[in-house]
């Protein structure tokens, strides 16, 4: 039995609140159960120096957690003078995931900066960030289209979403919360496109290796979960 009482293939309740920020070109407050992440997309009419005059744009991402997003207060990373390795890993993952579904030349020499700030954490912050960041990116591109800067369908090639899966209490489960994640025998994150393409798989065994059969079970849970998330994304941006 999962601590939450969910079935093995049952995700937490997922919601997207678009236009959460009145300042950002695109924004979304995404909720995966008790994990809440504010995702914003900010347009800059320039690209990094190494991309200048290259005829294409760029998507980059930053990730952070508010000090009291967790059970005990954490120090702001800015106060320590450097980002943790975990933070750097996650924000690079978010950027890679979004770039996988963007035609960078069609964006022009512009940069969109994605900021994912975890307001409340209960497991799956990176997967929620990727899934919500796609909504923010979509709305930023719609903002640009309304000003005759781009055509969304030329820039945004597909959906992208992410979900965690793991082996908990000897069962393959989807969308782990903190209690499950902290006790999981295997923990994996899957990033996939709406058309079923794999962007990234991260999997780690804790204590004992996992089998090919167990991985296949996790993969199927991820495919089904991401299909559900993409359907929710489509519903959100259609409203």
Curated annotation (Swiss-Prot):
EC number(s) recorded for this UniProt protein: 2.7.7.56
MF (Gene Ontology): 3'-5'-RNA exonuclease activity; tRNA binding; tRNA nucleotidyltransferase activity
Keyword hit for Nucleotidyltransferase: yes
CDD domains for this protein: RNase_PH_bact (cd11362)
Signal peptide segment: none
GO term, biological process aspect, one: rRNA processing
Enzyme class: transferase
Classification via InterPro entries: ExoRNase_PH_dom1, ExoRNase_PH_dom2, ExoRNase_PH_dom2_sf, PNPase/RNase_PH_dom_sf, Ribosomal_Su5_D2-typ_SF, RNase_PH, RNase_PH_bac-type, RNase_PH_CS
Annotated binding of phosphate, by residue: 86, 124-126
Key words of the record: Nucleotidyltransferase, RNA-binding, rRNA processing, Transferase, tRNA processing, tRNA-binding
UniProt cross-references to Gene3D superfamilies, sorted A to Z: GHMP Kinase, N-terminal domain
NCBIfam families: RNasePH (TIGR01966)
Subunit structure: Homohexameric ring arranged as a trimer of dimers.
Family per similarity comment: Belongs to the RNase PH family.
HAMAP family recorded: RNase_PH
Reported function: Phosphorolytic 3'-5' exoribonuclease that plays an important role in tRNA 3'-end maturation. Removes nucleotide residues following the 3'-CCA terminus of tRNAs; can also add nucleotides to the ends of RNA molecules by using nucleoside diphosphates as substrates, but this may not be physiologically important. Probably plays a role in initiation of 16S rRNA degradation (leading to ribosome degradation) during starvation.
Protein name: Ribonuclease PH
């Amino acid at each position: 039995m999962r601590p939450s009482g969910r079935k093995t293939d049952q995700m937490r309740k997922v919601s997207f609140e678009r236009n959460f920020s009145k300042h950002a070109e695109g924004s979304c407050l995404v909720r995966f159960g008790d994990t809440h992440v504010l995702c914003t997309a900010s347009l800059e009419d320039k690209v990094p120096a190494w991309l200048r005059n290259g005829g294409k744009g760029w998507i980059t991402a930053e990730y952070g957690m508010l000090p009291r997003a967790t059970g005990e207060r954490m120090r702001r990373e800015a106060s320590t003078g450097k980002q943790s390795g975990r933070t750097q890993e996650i924000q690079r993952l978010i950027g890679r995931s979004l770039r996988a579904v963007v035609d960078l030349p069609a964006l022009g020499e512009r940069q969109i900066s994605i900021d994912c700030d975890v307001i409340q954490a209960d497991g799956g912050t990176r997967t929620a960030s990727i899934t919500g960041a796609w909504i923010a990116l979509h709305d930023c591109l719609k903002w640009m289209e309304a000003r005759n800067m781009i055509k969304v369908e030329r820039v945004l090639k597909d959906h992208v979403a992410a979900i965690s899966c793991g082996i908990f209490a000897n069962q393959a489960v989807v969308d782990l919360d903190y209690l499950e994640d902290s006790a999981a025998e295997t923990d994996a994150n899957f990033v996939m496109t709406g058309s079923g393409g794999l962007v990234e798989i991260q999997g780690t065994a804790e204590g004992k290796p996992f089998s090919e059969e167990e991985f296949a079970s996790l993969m199927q849970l991820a495919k089904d979960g991401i299909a559900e998330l993409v359907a929710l994304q489509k519903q959100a941006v259609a409203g």
